[in-house]
Amino acid sequence: MKNEEIRFSDRRESQWLRELINEKWFAYIGVLIVSFLVSCTETVDNAVLSDKMPTIFPDYVGVTIPATIAPMNFNVEGDVDKVDVVVKGSKGGEMHVQGEYADFNLDDWHSLVASNKGGKLTFTVCAKSDGRWTRYRDFEMYVSKYDMKDYGLTYRRIAPGYEVYSHMGLYERRLDNFDERAIIENTQVPGMCVNCHTSCKTNPDNFVFHIRGDHGATLVKSGGKCELLKAKNDSIKGSMVYPYWHPSGKYCAFSTNMTRQGFHIVKDERVEVFDLSSDVFVYDIEKHQLILDTLLSTKLYSENSPVFSADGRTLYYLTSLQKEYPLQFKDQKYNLCSIAFDPEKGAFGNKVDTVYNAVSMGKTVTWPRPSYDGRYLMFTQMDYGYFSIWHKESDLWLLDLRTMKAQPLKAANSDDADSFHNWSIGSHWFVFTSRRIDGLYSHLYLSCIDEKGQPTKAFLLPQKNPKEYYTTSIYSF
């Protein structure tokens, strides 16, 4: 029963988690050995011209990238002995690499991409196989005019499984290079699960996550102090699950869910995660109090996945008439609703509005995420339920909060599950999970929204050697 978790972060996480759990630190003495290796760059002679694009992994052909992204290294598919790649910028600059795969120098890459912001890069790819070179049609990447100033991404990595907590952790990955480090791993809390981590916007000074297990709790960090909340109490029905911070950092909204899972017996469907009931409430960080309302805790309906608007005066959430499981699992469909919130008084309004009626279209929505500039709200739409990670038909949609019109993000979506998502602080770039590679593992993709609400073709999070990384890792994001 695992959900994807990803967030942008505007700077490196502090060491407070490590200090909190009294992790032992060891001093390492590093010995830097610098080796000067003489390598021969082979001249590409008598290359056979192909009218086809190179088949590369990841598929970076025609993608749009931010000027600060890590090198977009790629592998050429097939039985290839060596690749030769020349990259030219439309505004000037050129770089050349040759090797087993396209492995771009970090400094050279950033220099070239930065100087071509708002322009494009043209890639000329040659591949050597059986002693012969083939030159493919050139392809392009576009360098966006929109900045992505975020320091990195935070995410959970977790191995396959349904019942047992194997090795997992919350991790931080820089976006301008390939550096990754653990924020916390469950080896530090043996036999337990860590999940549902959320920061206030992209600021790690305010941070919350859950520790699941016999002695579990919800850890809330705010103002340099940490508080451990009981996983359950008499005021709420189930465990505290999906959190979202108020932009002021004074409140954090939660759902409380009685979650279960069941296994399908039909082809291509594995697991269905559902709730027997769920409610929504807000926690006052300063007063250490729950803010409850009967409108968000109804008997016949399940309320779920709360998020605050950019100005903090509206709480969006999901609601569905609770069905009987397992017989009516395909009838559980959620609408997107909202209720006013007064941050000065810490109180809700007196009526609920339906923002997006998915049920009337025979669909359901999940994971609402407002952009930080207040312009859009992104959500995932699918056939039923709310746990989209297991739904191949799930797609990302964008609701324009000015016109209240919604549209699918066709250029970013795929034929497999496109699911959990979060915005960059600039409200143009967003990250989301997708199972488009193999239908089994969730991986991270990035895309950008322009002024008209149109997305760019999504690209897979760059890795040093992408083929090696994505084919040998057994972890989902």
Language-model features and meaning:
Residues 40-477:
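Sequence signature of WD/YWTD-type beta-propeller architectures
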